[in-house]
Each structure stands twice: as C-alpha cells, then as structure tokens.
C-alpha cells in the first residue's frame, strides 16, 4: 500500500526520546507528551508517494518534523494521536516535513534546509555558553554552495532561527538558506559548542 502524496514512515525506536544514557545508566528526562523537544524525529521510510518523485527512497533513514509522531490532549483533555497516524506504528509524512535523508553514511538536506552547529562564547563577561547568531555549517545545500558557503564555513544567521535537532549526538540548528546572512573569516579561536547532554541522546 502506498500513499498518493505522502511518505509512510515508522519511528526508529520510540515516538518520544524520554531517556538518556549517563555513564551506562538510563535517566528519564521527560514524562510529558507536551514537550515537543523530546519527540523522536528519526524515522525509516516504508513507502514513497506515487504522485511525484524525490531523491528519498524506501528504506532511507530520515529526520522529520516533530508533529508527525506527536501525541497531544484534545479539547476534552483526552490524550490522542497525531492526525498523521496511519496505524500499526506507521505514520503519514509530507515531503516538506522531511529535513534530511541519509544516503550511505552521509546526511543530505531536503530543499533549502541546512544545519548549523553553534560555537562557544569567548566573552569572559558573558554567562551565555554559545555565541548568538553565529555558527559553523555542518550540513549545507546546493543553494549555499552556489553562493560560496560550504560545510565547515563560519556564518551568521537571523535571530530566532534556533530550531533544535540532535543529529549523530550533536545539537544542530535547522534553518533555511535565506536565514544565512553572512560568511565570516575564522579568527582561530572558534570552537564548536555541543552540550554534554546532547552526546548522551
């Protein structure tokens, strides 16, 4: 069975990432269905839509929007599944809800999506652990490459674009090509900032 316009996917593991591993011990970090940050966003593609073609293939591992697997409370206070639920741990997912797909061992972006890792804040007078609106391109795209912005480059981005994902135990910010404002030259003291909890996810 295939959907006409949607991918059919299943979560890799549970729908929520409620546990982290700390030194071999499991720690429960969430007990609420309302916390979208801990919804699992990693899925496996079971079928692709029949109405159009994309580079994504059946069996691919993908990173998707949190609303696909989300549970929520309806107007009666009852816990219900997402409207994307297809049954038997299967879910419908639109193409624009997919941000990355994995080909072999490399994550590839869908459309204009790109992923930025923040850098450490070197200001000794600041208590913020990372520099605001600045980071390193970890996963670029064709548009950025055509503009001379490549993976590994230091860039500045628009405010409030910190859409957080954990990809291969790194906390990255997902954004669009037009969220990237400037390419900086490295000064030599920049370091990627990845909080310790992300490495345990």
Regions found by a protein language model. Give the residues of each.
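Acidic-enriched and Gly/Ser
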Residues: 1-201
